[in-house]
Each structure stands twice: as C-alpha cells, then as structure tokens.
UniProtKB/Swiss-Prot annotation:
Entry-linked InterPro entries: Ald_DH/histidinol_DH (IPR016161), Ald_DH_C (IPR016163), Ald_DH_N (IPR016162), Aldehyde_DH_dom (IPR015590), G-glutamylP_reductase_CS (IPR020593), Glu-5-SA_DH (IPR012134), GPR_dom (IPR000965)
GO MF, any single term: NADP binding
Family: Belongs to the gamma-glutamyl phosphate reductase family.
Keyword annotations from UniProtKB, A to Z: Amino-acid biosynthesis, Cytoplasm, NADP, Oxidoreductase, Proline biosynthesis
Official protein name in the record: Gamma-glutamyl phosphate reductase
The EC number(s) this enzyme carries: 1.2.1.41
GO biological process, one term: L-proline biosynthetic process
Compartment(s) where it occurs, according to its Swiss-Prot or TrEMBL record: Cytoplasm
Catalytic activity: L-glutamate 5-semialdehyde + phosphate + NADP(+) = L-glutamyl 5-phosphate + NADPH + H(+)
Amino acid sequence: MKELILKGERAKEASYVLMNATTSEKNDALIKMGQKLLENKEYIIAENKKDLENAMLKGTSKAMLDRLYLDEKRLEDMADGLNQLVNLNDPIGEVITMWKRPNGLQIGKQRVPMGVIGIIYEARPNVTCDAAGLCLKAGNAVILRGGSEAINSNKAIVKALCEGIKESGLPEYSLQLIENTSREIANEMMRLNEYIDVLIPRGGAGLIQAVVKNATVPVIETGVGNCHVYVDEEADFKMAEDIIINAKTSRPAVCNAEEKLLVNEKIAEEFLPKIISALREKNVEVRGDSSVMKIVDDVKEATDEDWGKEYLDFIIGIKIVNNIDEAIKHINKYGSGHSEAIITNNYQNSQKFLQRVDAAAVYVNASTRFTDGCEFGFGAEIGISTQKLHARGPMGLNELTTTKYIIYGNGQIR
C-alpha cells in the first residue's frame, strides 16, 4: 500500500504541472516518447518474447497471443500513434460555450484535465503506449496496472516512454506503472480516491465487473463487446457475407468483433448454408439454436449462456428470428451496449434498428469492427465506453477531460 500511495502522491504532483503545460510542451514529450520507443525496440521485443513464451506454456489461445505479440512493425505503429496525437487539437483550455446573463456576467464552460487517471488492463502492451500518450496530451497524469501476462513488455515500454517524458522537461512521474500484478494491489488501487480521479478498466467481462463492483474511485466502464449482426429479410447476401466474415474473423479477440449472428427466418434456409460454409472455411466454430440445427448439419447447440457470452475467439452464435422486432429485443436483452449492426436494403427497417437498439455504436450495412477512435477520426482511443454517464463509445482526447465554469464580472453581487 505504501508503494501505491507514493505513486499516487507523485501522480497528483505531476498532474498539477501537466494541467498548465502548453500544447508545444506536451507535443514535444509525445515526439520524444515515440523516439525512445523505437530506440529501445530490440530490448522491448526481447522482453515481449519472455511474455509470449510464458503465455504459450500456459496454453493461451492464438487470438490472445495475437493481442500480446509485439514486433518491429507494431512498435512502429505505436510510435506513429504517438506522433498522430501531436497533430490532434489540444482540447485543454477550449471554451465550449459562453453566454451573457442579464446582470452582465459572462459565463463560459471550459475543458480541463481530469487530473490523475488510473487504468487497469489485461494482456495488451499497445494499451500501455496508447494510454500514456492520450492521457499526457489531455493534460492528465496516469497510473497503469497491466496484467501479469504482459508485465515484461509493459515494464520495457514504460521505461522507454518515461525517458522521453523526462527528456522533454515534463515530470517523469506523469506516467507510472504498478509492477506488482497481484489482485490485492489492484483492489487497493480501486480505492485510491485521494489520488486517482477516475478509473478506466480495459479487458474482459470478468475484469470489468470486478472493477465496477469493488472500486470506490469513479469508474468509466469499457470494452465488453457481445456484438451482433442482424441480417434482415431484405439484405444483400454478398454484402452480408463480407461484413460477417470481416466482423468475426479479422481480429476475433477484440471487443468490436462480432460474436452473434441473427438471421431473419424468411431468408434463413437460403442464407445460412452459405454463411456457415464461409465461416467454417475461416475455422470458425458455429453454435446455433434448434432452428439453425435443422437447416445445417453439424452445428453445435447453443446454450442460454452462449447468448450473453463474449467469446473473443473463432466462435460464433447464430439464431433465427421471426422479424426485426425480435432481433432488436434479443440484442437489447443480451448485448453489452457496444456495437450492433443491421444488413438491409429496407430504409424503414434501418431507421427502426438505429432508433431502438440501445448501444454506443449502431451500424447500417457496415462491420462492427469500425468502432474505433482512429476509424471515427478521433485519433487513438483509451477504450470503448459502454456506459451512458460522462462518455459513450470510443473515448478520445475530449473524453479524457472534464469541464469547469469560468465567470467574468465587473463587480456584480447577489
């Protein structure tokens, strides 16, 4: 606990410097962080190899190994991500709106940093770099607690990034990593209200639920993605197949991957054999309801548990629905509020789906894989918020700020 309190104190001190840092000072730090990342790439890759070897010994799935894996190209992408942040507008100090009251007071609403952000995440070392860069650009100090699976990678990345921050003249404690990966330390971090202003968990359902349940620090819930694609009776089959294959197989272990497929009963007999064959060619295990099993052989029966499960693997659950209303009802019951899609050429059905599905991102005729800060034009993101308070959807720089009111007067009293 002493180590945590020390990190909290240092982060709080750093946050007071960062909140007043100029855009050029922050951008200089980001550039130097990217440079140090590449200068240390051989060391980082060697440390990442240790994590990969440990993960393989534990029987980690291929999809999860892909999340953990770093090579020169991925490190270059991470450094490029830091440089892209340099080109994004600095939200700090922006006056969102201003108005004048009848008594002459001028009242404005201005963006300011959150302060100290805590991030608890799993085996994705790229998150270490993304989080550090985003928090710094938005004027926040950050305390990271990554998973044990990526501890060697994270230590190496943070060491390099901190060298860049220190060289720029900003406080080196703007970025800190908790190297103790025990659950007890994570629980203590969740209750560090005196120092941490907001906590953001990134990972699977178990991690996020544990943080939401145990934290006394305010939490922005992110990431669990039980995403659906509904194929309407008026869908273009070729478009539907392309979208489903992309959404399921391009990167199955990410939160915006498709997990469930809903098919209108009027097209099921024609469409299901085609799409299941295409999925199997990509080595996807298909689980279906009893209606699906009657149409296609060798489909594993889906259980009630399947409908609410995020697989993060080459597995998909398929259900036949009577109509769009049943599809929407199913999605709102079992979905995680992340990303949902409809494939249809019917305008009325597309609008009904957009209006009635309760999710952060709702698509018409496009893959759920686009729910991403860069794809939305925000630059990198800290995560995908699935809650409704403060932020919803991809969380870019603006979502890492809060606001304060600034009031100009000329002697008014009340």
